[in-house]
């Protein structure tokens, strides 16, 4: 994962933002740090349904059994939210992902109450899709 903070640093950085405008800008910046997704990975198999914007997420298991996540979106905030999810699932096995609840982290960040309903639904769709695919890999 290129230049993304770990979970604890994400939370620290997020709470240091003075207001929600700064927090949104930080989320967008995180999305800009994601590695470029290969064009061939932008296919129906990797499409996340339930998002208003176009979202693709690719999951691969490396030689050590760790899940590597890559993704892209045509919306900057959604791509940033994707980066947040990837940070939370970083260095986990498929089984770890299935059993890890990201919602307490979102509560610590006060994230969900500041998202529009459509973005919240899209965020949930990304999490459901990642966990469902992880369940098939575990």
Curated annotation (Swiss-Prot):
Organism annotation: Salmonella paratyphi B (strain ATCC BAA-1250 / SPB7)
Its subcellular locations are: Cytoplasm
**UniProt name for this protein:** Cysteine desulfuration protein SufE
**Coding gene?**
sufE
- What is the top-level taxon of the source organism? Bacteria
Q: Which family does it belong to?
A: Belongs to the SufE family.
Q: Which InterPro entries match?
A: Cysteine_desulfuration_SufE (IPR023939), Fe-S_metab-assoc_dom (IPR003808)
- What keywords are annotated for this sequence in UniProt? Cytoplasm
Its annotated pathway reads:
Cofactor biosynthesis; iron-sulfur cluster biosynthesis
């Amino acid at each position: 994962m290129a230049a993304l903070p770990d979970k604890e640093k994400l939370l620290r950085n997020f709470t240091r933002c003075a207001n929600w405008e700064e927090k949104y800008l930080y989320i967008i910046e995180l999305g800009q740090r994601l590695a470029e997704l290969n064009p061939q990975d932008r296919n129906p198999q990797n499409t996340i349904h339930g998002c208003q914007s176009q979202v693709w997420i690719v999951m691969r298991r490396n030689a050590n059994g760790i899940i590597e996540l890559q993704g892209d979106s045509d919306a900057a905030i959604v791509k940033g939210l994707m980066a947040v999810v990837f940070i939370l699932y970083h260095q986990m096995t498929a089984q770890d992902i299935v059993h890890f609840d990201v919602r307490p982290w979102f509560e610590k960040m006060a994230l969900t109450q500041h998202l529009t309903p459509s973005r919240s639904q899209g965020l949930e769709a990304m999490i459901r899709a990642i966990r469902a695919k992880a369940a098939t890999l575990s």
